[in-house]
């Protein structure tokens, strides 16, 4: 250990210094002698004095050491000192620690930190493991963890059962072109695109079920809102109708946003004073059918990338989804509903009034585009077989899933929420890669 010259014995460490977690130190500890551990966040020195911030568990404390010592960012320290009133007129901290002694863990001063405020996005991602040591990036961990807990709490309050489905599968849900294929012993298998089918098997027993798990899409999409591996919040509800499904997702989204900002809003404002937090959306969300959305874009003079009009049958890209939120939704989320059968997978229930459409929806969020997709599910055996044939799938591969339409079927539906997209919206991130720990996409699979 590197010690300041006053011995531990002389300081009577055991008797005089209260060992306390840095995150628990408060103004109520004023004038107390404390021992705590943390990492140097920043440091500046004078002729015979050192000022540094020590950080741990998303909290920092100001420290004053009446000796000159060169400390670098990320150096691990145990300090012994006294809590006193902050004497700096430039700092707004309520208190500071007058350090009487410090220990440098393993006698190791950290090397020069490779990141700063001017670092590019790619450099930040390259050093993602160190970027976490910066306050804003490190706070992402707390934000993500908090939002996950909030979502779980809401499901728990709604009597949902959480399941942990497999992620190695032999069936597809969202189309074969986006599957990651692998060898599973002597058979072909895939990384899951969605856990929906497994949730459907649970719904007749649990009535309400959800999972929060990784899903994988082999899409070569080089955008700010796509990941190859993402956190998928999926739910399935038995004995419901389309309106019930819509109400459930509206409740989940609005309540998640409210609780998230109630919990972390002040901290976010302190870290990002330049951004404006999202408002909690008003319910019910505005709705527009897919065919009407096509007409709306044309009426607004919004063209496709090739400068032609949209026609029924076209996919609506995320850039135009944002326009729908801005102009039709007036800056609020919009539910786009009743997509064409050929747009959606085999399992979606047909609209009873128009069987060219499905009882489906995408939730479009301002500034992001789609963050949730959902539908009522087919519950008729013969119509499921028709769906498999339409998409060129072998029903024998889905024999277990077809049993759901034979053994006690009911009207049921569900949805999948892209967790990182929601977090991206709430934290006002400019890139979805900020919403996950170590992004996986066409550019990154390291570390």
UniProtKB/Swiss-Prot annotation:
For this protein, the parts annotated as crossing the membrane are none
Localization:
Cytoplasm
What's one GO MF term for it? ATP binding
Q: Which GO terms describe its biological process?
A: asparaginyl-tRNA aminoacylation
Keyword Aminoacyl-tRNA synthetase included in the entry's annotation: yes
Coarsely, its chief localization is: cytoplasm
Q: What Pfam families has UniProt attached to this entry?
A: tRNA-synt_2
Cell inner membrane listed as a keyword: no
Q: Give the EC number(s) listed in the UniProt record.
A: 6.1.1.22
Describe the reaction catalysed, as an equation: tRNA(Asn) + L-asparagine + ATP = L-asparaginyl-tRNA(Asn) + AMP + diphosphate + H(+)
A cellular component annotation (GO) from this entry: cytoplasm
UniProt-listed InterPro entries: Aa-tRNA-synt_II (IPR004364), aa-tRNA-synth_II (IPR006195), aa-tRNA-synth_II/BPL/LPL (IPR045864), Asn-tRNA-ligase (IPR004522), Asp/Asn-tRNA-synth_IIb (IPR002312), NA-bd_OB-fold (IPR012340)
Q: Which UniProt keywords apply?
A: Aminoacyl-tRNA synthetase, ATP-binding, Cytoplasm, Ligase, Nucleotide-binding, Protein biosynthesis
Report which superkingdom the organism of origin falls in: Eukaryota
Family stated for the protein in its record: Belongs to the class-II aminoacyl-tRNA synthetase family.
Q: What is this protein called?
A: Probable asparagine--tRNA ligase, cytoplasmic
Q: Which organism is it from?
A: Vairimorpha ceranae (strain BRL01)
